[in-house]
């Protein structure tokens, strides 16, 4: 292998290490930003946000959906994993409030008996707009979805930051490997050349 290729290996290694350092810095900054943003919201898990208690509440509400297995009861939400956990509990709370129905499954308008309807003629009249009154259960679901999506986005952002850190470490190790291999080859080449020069001198001296 020629010397330019060996030097190219060293340069490539240095570039990979530089990219690795950059990726780690960006990843750490991203995770720190997620943590700071969540801390500013001062979100704390409610007392029932444990697997055991939410299972009892879900059973009483007649829910048959998958339940959270994490625990954030009384815990300040300051990282992506806890944000995702909190969002899962929020969804269960919303289902309890809507009788286990999602937004699309609920009637569009409110009725006097609370059952709801999608028929405008049977709906309660909104005193302000004089039109059919919207189903309040749907508003609960909209609020939960908006907040839950924001929390899930925080989890995704934190995961991307972690991925950047891992990739940065991998790039640094790869770059270091290139440098070690290239430096080793250069060292062996130098030794070989010095050995050849010495042998030539000895041969010349012997010939004289």
Language-model regions: role of each:
Residues 37, 89, 93, 150, ...:
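Residues that form generic nucleotide/phosphate-binding pockets
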Residues 126-171:
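Short, aromatic-rich amphipathic segments at membrane interfaces
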Residues 1-34, 173, 190:
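Hydrophobic secretory-pathway targeting helix
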Residues 25-30, 35-36, 152-160, 188-193:
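Membrane-interface extramembranous regions
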Residues 45-142:
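Long, solvent-exposed extracytoplasmic domains/loops
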Residues 1-8, 157-208:
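Juxtamembrane interface at the cytosolic side of transmembrane helices
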Residues 22-55:
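Membrane-helix exit/juxtamembrane interface segments
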């Amino acid at each position: 292998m020629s010397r330019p290729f060996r030097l190219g290996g060293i340069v490539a290694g240095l570039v990979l290490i530089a990219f690795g350092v950059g990726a780690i810095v960006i990843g750490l900054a991203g995770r720190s930003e997620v943590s700071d943003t969540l801390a500013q919201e001062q979100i704390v898990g409610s007392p029932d946000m444990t697997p055991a208690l939410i299972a009892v509440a879900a059973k009483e509400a007649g829910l048959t959906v998958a339940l959270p297995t994490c625990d954030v009861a009384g815990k300040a939400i300051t990282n992506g994993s806890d944000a995702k956990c909190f969002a899962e509990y929020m969804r269960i709370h919303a289902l309890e409030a809507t009788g286990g129905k999602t937004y699309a499954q609920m009637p569009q308008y409110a009725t006097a008996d609370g059952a709801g309807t999608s028929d405008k003629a049977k709906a309660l009249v909104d005193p302000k707009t004089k039109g059919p009154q919207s189903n309040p259960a749907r508003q609960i679901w909209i609020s939960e979805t908006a907040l839950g999506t924001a929390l899930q986005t925080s989890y995704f952002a934190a995961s991307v930051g972690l991925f950047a850190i891992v990739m940065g470490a991998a790039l640094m190790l790869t770059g270091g490997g290139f440098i070690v291999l290239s430096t080793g080859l250069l060292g062996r080449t130098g030794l070989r050349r010095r050995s050849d020069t010495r042998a030539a001198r000895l041969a010349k001296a012997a010939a004289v």
